[in-house]
Swiss-Prot record:
Positions bound to D-ribulose 5-phosphate: 103
Keyword tags: Lyase, Pyridoxal phosphate, Schiff base
Keyword Lyase: yes
Pfam families in alphabetical order: SOR_SNZ
InterPro entries given in the database record: Aldolase_TIM, PdxS/SNZ, PdxS/SNZ_N, RibuloseP-bd_barrel
One MF term in the entry's GO annotations: amine-lyase activity
Species lineage: Bacteria, Thermotogati, Thermotogota, Thermotogae, Thermotogales
Binding, D-glyceraldehyde 3-phosphate: 166
UniProt cross-references to PROSITE patterns, sorted A to Z: PDXS_SNZ_1, PDXS_SNZ_2
Function: Catalyzes the formation of pyridoxal 5'-phosphate from ribose 5-phosphate (RBP), glyceraldehyde 3-phosphate (G3P) and ammonia. The ammonia is provided by the PdxT subunit. Can also use ribulose 5-phosphate and dihydroxyacetone phosphate as substrates, resulting from enzyme-catalyzed isomerization of RBP and G3P, respectively.
Name listed for the protein in its UniProt record: Pyridoxal 5'-phosphate synthase subunit PdxS
Catalytic residues identified in the record: 82 (schiff-base intermediate with d-ribose 5-phosphate)
Length: 293
């Protein structure tokens, strides 16, 4: 267990390097290069962006090895890739391929309706989505080195990401005021290990990096998530479904860097072209955020 714990600390440290940055979904070597040139701290290699997964339906699986390898060979920044929730074999394949990070993602069709992957068994670090503190701490207990809001991917609508980030931050604030016996009871209530709740109380935050994701479509959206306490931002469909991906990618990076400077935010929000068309979350037939437990 000590070896696993030590390895987790190293994985967690790797994720810390992404703080204050943008991680972009890409589906080709060309898109990966655009992301790198714009200043992305990493890219997420995909066959289809979430908006297309949502539109086309069917079973969404790990991207093809050829696609991921093409993207890995195109850039020098870290490359992440998604696996289905609970799909141990997909994760082992990606680890063997040499990706830098794995996202056990609700954007893909879950492979296991009872268990997430035991991430301690892998050398490669994992990022997982969460809607609240209980979900975040369950994933960390399984070995996740990084957390992100689930939001509602592929919608271009930031409302769910805002809801999830606010909920986590509010719950953390509550935890910092609790006595130990209250932490024990709260851990049972939200399904979280009390040891991790004690760590949250001590730190006043999650014990790992916490990014925003799901529905970020404009530089203003990205800045908003930073204002709410995110350590950085994942942008999925928002860049390459916009009218001018190069401009949008650069603007997203600048917005995350200068989130607390309205003058700069105004400047970078001008002349970036049309953002992706958004969807009303209330009208969705499939809510990806509800996948996972």
């Amino acid at each position: 267990m000590e070896i696993k714990k030590g390895t987790w600390i190293i994985k967690k440290g790797f994720a810390e390097m992404f703080k204050g940055g943008v991680i972009m979904d890409v589906t080709s070597a060309e898109q990966a290069k655009i992301a790198e040139e714009a200043g992305a701290v990493a890219v997420m290699a995909l066959e289809r962006v979430p908006a297309d997964i949502r539109k086309e339906g069917g079973v969404a699986r790990m991207a093809s090895i050829a696609k991921i390898r093409e993207i890995m060979e195109a850039v020098s920044i870290p490359v992440m890739a998604k696996v289905r929730i609970g799909h141990i074999a997909e994760a082992k394949i990606l680890e063997e391929l040499g990706v830098d990070f794995i996202d056990e993602s609700e954007v893909l069709t879950p492979a296991d309706d009872r268990f997430h992957i035991n991430k301690h068994e892998f050398k490669v670090p994992f990022v997982c989505g969460a809607r609240d503190l209980g979900e975040a701490l369950r994933r960390i207990a399984e070995g996740a080195a990084m957390i992100r809001t689930k939001g509602e991917a592929g919608t271009g609508n930031v409302v769910e990401a805002v809801k999830h980030m606010r909920r986590v931050m509010e719950q953390i604030k509550q935890v910092t005021k609790m006595e130990d016996e209250e932490l024990v009871a709260y851990g049972k209530e939200i399904g979280a290990p009390v040891e991790l709740l004690r760590e949250v109380k001590r730190l006043g935050r999650l014990p790992v990096v916490n990014f925003a994701a799901g529905g970020v479509a404009t530089p203003a959206d990205a800045a908003l998530m930073m204002m709410l306490g995110a350590d950085g931002v994942f942008v999925g469909s928002g860049i390459f479904k916009s009218k001018d991906p190069r401009k949008m990618a650069k603007a997203m990076v600048l917005a995350v860097t200068y989130w607390d400077n309205p003058r700069i935010l105004l400047k970078i929000s001008e002349d970036i072209g049309e953002p992706m068309r958004g969807l009303d979350v209330e009208e969705l037939e499939v809510r990806m955020q509800e996948r996972g437990w």
